[in-house]
Structure formats: structure tokens, C-alpha cells
Amino acid sequence: MCSSDLSAAAGELAGWADHPAGRLGLILLLDQLPRNLHRGTPAAFAQDDKARALCLKGLSFGADRGLSPLARVFFYLPLEHAESREQQARSVALFEALAAEQAQGPARETFEGFADFARRHQVIIQHFGRFPHRNAILGRESTPEEVAFLRQPGSGF
């Protein structure tokens, strides 16, 4: 882990959350950075709860509304990564609303793609209650149905 990743995980950068851009920075450090630095290990998901809490708290007072549409995509990703049906529903609603806001703009297809990706995540959680592609990494036993799903092309992210 890099020093900013460790500092964010330890709560040392909590003051950043006082401003929308700082809150987004913390979300990126806790959600995206671990997924890329620690891909294939449990550490990739270790800060998900913290990132999700920052996202949800920010949503409660509209912190996302002060960000650009593309920045909001990253603000919402902790919900898309959640193994929770409720949070997946919220993710889809947010991404669909964002796509609707961009419906007349030049990035329409890009934002429709983000909404589609959120829906794909939601379908998996609705069916399994978790992301089967994380099972081996997190030491969870896969069900026969999950194993069959994982053998399908395009089943992972």
C-alpha cells in the first residue's frame, strides 16, 4: 500500500470528507486504489466498508451534486461494488439518473454504459447475494451454481 492509501485506511485523512472533491478523493483512495494495487488479493476489498460509508454519508447531504458527471461515477462506485441488494438498487438508480442527465449530451453513450454496468452488477447480487468472482480471493466456498456461472464467458468484471 502507498502512504496515502494507508493514511486513508487509518482515518488520517478524514478532514478531506468536509468537501465534495476531498470526499471523492477519499473514496478513490479506499475503493479504486486497493482494487488496482491489490488485485487478486483480499486487500483489494478491505476498505470497501469505509468507501461505502463515505459515499452514503455524502449522498445524505448532496455532496455528489457538487461534482462533475464523470466524478460522480467514481463517487457512486462503492455502491456498485457492494454485496447488498439494497445498495445495488441505489447504485442503479444513481447511475440511471446520471445517464438521464446526460441523455442529450455528447457523452450519452458513455453514461448509458455506466448505467448498464451497474445493472449487470445488480443482477449478480440479486441472484447470488454476493459476487461469485470474489469467492476464491476471499476464501469463500462457491456453490455449484456459482461455479457454473463463473464458467460462462463474461461472468466477471
Predicted features by range, described:
Residues 2-3:
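Short, small-residue-biased leader/transition segments that mark boundaries at the very start
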Residues 7-19, 35-39:
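Conserved interaction-surface patches within small, structured recognition/assembly domains
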Residues 14-24, 63-70:
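Structural motif
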Residues 22-33:
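Amphipathic alpha-helical regulatory regions
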Residues 28, 74-78, 118:
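Short alpha-helical scaffolding segments that buttress acidic/His motifs in well-ordered protein cores
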Residues 29, 36-66:
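Helix-adjacent hinge/juxtasegments
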Residues 52-103:
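A contiguous pocket-lining binding segment that forms or flanks enzyme active sites
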Residues 100-157:
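C-terminal accessory segment of soluble enzyme catalytic cores
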